[in-house]
C-alpha cells in the first residue's frame, strides 16, 4: 500500500463532489450569488494551507467511513445543507466517477493528469476569487513537488492502492449506463479502442531478441481492437493541455444523474459489516480525523444570510425512498470509533469539533456520556 495515495484520493473525490454540487445548484435554480458562495466557501476550505500540509504527510488510507466524514464536513462548509440520502448519493457519485477514471488511466502516472484536470476545473468555479485560485495553485505546486519525482513503479503502487480502496463499490450510475461504459451489474467496461499509452506502440507486433539484445525475429498478430498511437503527452505544467479527458466535468451536459445499488454491491455490503466488527485501526482513524479536521478552517456564516437545502434527487419523495431503501451496511451515518480511554485526545477532538458551525438542530435525546464521534456525526 502506498503512503502517497491520500492527497490524490482526496483531491479527485473533492473535484467530483464540486462537479455534482455545481450541476445540482443550477438544476434547482439556486440564485447565482448563493451558488457562487457555496462553491467558493467549500473550495476555500478544501484548499486551506494547513489542511493541505496535513494531507500531504505520508500516511496510509483509512476506511471509507472516515473519509466520508471529512467530505460531510466539507459539503456543509457553507450555507448549503444536504439530507442524509442526498449526501449518500453525492458520495456514491464521487467514488464511482473517480473509480472509473483510475480504471481507464492509460498509464499509472496519468492519475496525476486526472488530478490536474480536476484542479483546472475547480479554478474555473472560483475565477472571480484570486485568493482562492492562489490556494489551488499552491496545491498544484505541492503535487508537482511530491509526485514529480516518483518512479513508474511508485505510481503503479498508488494505482493499486486506489483500486483496492474502490474494489467493492459497484453502484450503477445513469450517465455511465447511458454511455455504455458500465454494465447492469455495476462493473465498468474497459475499451478495446482509442489511443494507446504515450510512449508505447499500437499492439500487433511481437519482437524476439537474442541474448545480446539484437532483434532476430518479428511476428505480427491480429489484436482485435481499434487502437491508434498517442499524438502527444499531456502537460504536467501549471497551465497546459492535459490531452487526457478523464477528470473533466461529465455533468456539463446538464444530464440528470441517478444511482442504483447493484446486487453485487448489496452482497458485498452485507459481507463487510464494517461497523459491527471491531476495527483495529479505530484509534488511527480517530487520529486521522482529528488531524485532518483540525486543519480545516470552517468559516462561520457572517450576517443573517439564510441557508438552503440542496436535494440531489428529482423530488423529495425520491430522496425519502432512497433513504429507506439503502442497505443499512452502506449507511455512513455513524462511525463506531471508541476513544474513551484517551482523555487528552477526547478533549482535543472536542475542541476541534467545537469550531464547526452547523445550523441544523441537534437531536434532543442525546445523553451527556455520548461518544464524541457519534456526536460528530449528528452535527
Swiss-Prot record:
Q: What is this protein called?
A: Protein OSCP1
The gene designation is Oscp1
GO MF annotation list: transmembrane transporter activity
Which species does the entry assign this protein to?
A: Mus musculus
Top-rank taxon of the source lineage equals Eukaryota
Q: Name one Pfam family in it.
A: Oscp1
Provide the protein's localization: Basal cell membrane
UniProt-listed GO biological process terms: xenobiotic detoxification by transmembrane export across the plasma membrane
- Keyword Transmembrane assigned to the entry: answer is no
- Disulfide linkage: none
Where does the entry say this protein is expressed, by tissue? Predominantly expressed in testis.
Q: State its role.
A: May be involved in drug clearance in the placenta.
Key words of the record: Cell membrane, Membrane, Transport
Signal peptide start and end residues: none
GO CC annotation terms, alphabetical: basal plasma membrane; cytoplasm
